[in-house]
Amino acid sequence: MGNCCSHGRDSADNGDALENGASASNAANSTGPTAEASVPQSKHAPPSPPPATKQGPIGPVLGRPMEDVKASYSLGKELGRGQFGVTHLCTQKATGHQFACKTIAKRKLVNKEDIEDVRREVQIMHHLTGQPNIVELKGAYEDKHSVHLVMELCAGGELFDRIIAKGHYSERAAASLLRTIVQIVHTCHSMGVIHRDLKPENFLLLNKDENSPLKATDFGLSVFYKPGEVFKDIVGSAYYIAPEVLKRKYGPEADIWSIGVMLYILLCGVPPFWAESENGIFNAILRGHVDFSSDPWPSISPQAKDLVKKMLNSDPKQRLTAAQVLNHPWIKEDGEAPDVPLDNAVMSRLKQFKAMNNFKKVALRVIAGCLSEEEIMGLKEMFKGMDTDSSGTITLEELRQGLAKQGTRLSEYEVQQLMEAADADGNGTIDYGEFIAATMHINRLDREEHLYSAFQHFDKDNSGYITMEELEQALREFGMNDGRDIKEIISEVDGDNDGRINYDEFVAMMRKGNPDPIPKKRRELSFK
């Protein structure tokens, strides 16, 4: 979480959310990887429940039972070191897969705000895990001395190191790279997250392959936000801080400024605002003068300069949004970014949910109920943002307005279709449970204990099978018996044609159609 500036609690609203973020009541729903649930070994044996684990005392940081990360992982060499913690290579004992483990010493969390920062980082990483080009959180652990975040390993190194190694670098390559970075930020903003520390060091390559995916990392300063919410903390890294951050009145537009600074560096090799001291850098940022006359700027295209100017507009209200940057002519020159409204993450998940059968939708409702507060805090904040009258439900108009605020333009028919998809009981509104089920990321289906809980919900008599009668009863409980022949649903899932669904068939249905989980300073640059 290292940075050059102070950081802490942003607003009473965010603070309250964090205070309730990972309560002891959710202790049983630990987010750290656990012993794999026992899966039935034959189609005739009922599945066994996941083995019970002895729970430790409640940790003061994550607010749930403490666990020893070394029970599941072996820690190896040091990969990096920051203000608050150290990152080590770690190996999962059960699989041999390698990850990165960020260890935060609890003795360095000296006040309530520091603890809330760590909780929020965990909540935000859970919220964003599964999104393209964002590093995945595999589990969070707390022991007596430290908090450990086990994350996807990005073994390809820092983005700018790769660029330096390549040598020659074209505007087209810069545009392609910027497109990926802005798409990451668009995803964060559409999911109600401001990164607040965007800089080249926080973009890593997944592996050393030529076409390795780019991953955004380090969400230690990130915050949840609602449209119109104003933040006051001065956070970030000096070269990349927006002027409104220095004025203590800012929102998601500050992330666009930071990317604009990165683009300027990509194109000419030095930052736009430079001085010998941090205060000198801040004064240069507040003056806002950007040099486009020194080499190599005369040879850089007018379209590139136009985009930099619009991203480094000192007035955040006039600055481009992430969606507008993606539709800028310089970004679009190779035709890869179409001039159409972009789906935000919630929109994409609603569309995916709409295509599922009712059996799978009910199973997702059950799984949603198994998730811990820290896993769904981001979605909880998004629900509250859309539920403008605080009624506990989202109406058609609130859904339309909520998606519009996230930059999604939809026809009346499209909004109605999404409403009908999420409104499982057909009462004309979306309640909290329906919203979580429809918008949680399908990577939650990787957790064996979640799948087993859902299977047990249907298997009322614990026979190890879901019968037509049990399925019909479950659909009726959730108001989702839409008249479709239960036999038709069973036949889609019943692989061995015995007229009922066993655990393996249930798991296959839940994971069908879902993407496989992935196994898991300033630089003087000169680009021609």
UniProtKB/Swiss-Prot annotation:
UniProt xrefs under Gene3D superfamilies: EF-hand, Phosphorylase Kinase, domain 1, Transferase(Phosphotransferase) domain 1
Region annotated Autoinhibitory domain sits at 337-367
Instruction: Provide the topology term for how it sits in the membrane.
Output: Lipid-anchor
User: Where is Ca(2+) 2 bound in this sequence?
Assistant: D423, D425, N427, T429, E434
Q: What does this protein do?
A: May play a role in signal transduction pathways that involve calcium as a second messenger.
Which keywords has UniProt assigned to this entry? ATP-binding, Calcium, Kinase, Lipoprotein, Membrane, Metal-binding, Myristate, Nucleotide-binding, Phosphoprotein, Repeat, Serine/threonine-protein kinase, Transferase
Q: Quote the InterPro entries the UniProt record gives.
A: CDPK_Ser/Thr_kinases (IPR050205), EF-hand-dom_pair (IPR011992), EF_Hand_1_Ca_BS (IPR018247), EF_hand_dom (IPR002048), Kinase-like_dom_sf (IPR011009), Prot_kinase_dom (IPR000719), Protein_kinase_ATP_BS (IPR017441), Ser/Thr_kinase_AS (IPR008271)
Q: What is the lineage of its organism?
A: Eukaryota, Viridiplantae, Streptophyta, Embryophyta, Tracheophyta
Catalytic class of the enzyme: transferase
Modified sites of kind Phosphoserine: S237
Coiled coil located at which positions?
A: none
In this chain, Ca(2+) 1 is annotated as bound at D387, D389, S391, T393, E398
* Protein name, entry field: Calcium-dependent protein kinase 17
Please give the Pfam families that the UniProt record associates with this protein: EF-hand_7 (PF13499), Pkinase (PF00069)
Which residues are involved in binding Ca(2+) 4?
D494, D496, D498, R500, E505
Domain (Protein kinase): residue spans on this chain: 73-331
Location of this chain's protein in the cell: Membrane
What biological processes does GO assign it?
protein autophosphorylation; regulation of pollen tube growth
Which positions bind ATP?
L79, G80, R81, G82, Q83, F84, G85, V86, T87, K102
Give me the residues that bind Ca(2+) 3, please. Answer: D459, D461, S463, Y465, E470
- The segments labelled Disordered in the record are 1-65
PANTHER family, alphabetized: SERINE/THREONINE-PROTEIN KINASE (PTHR24349)
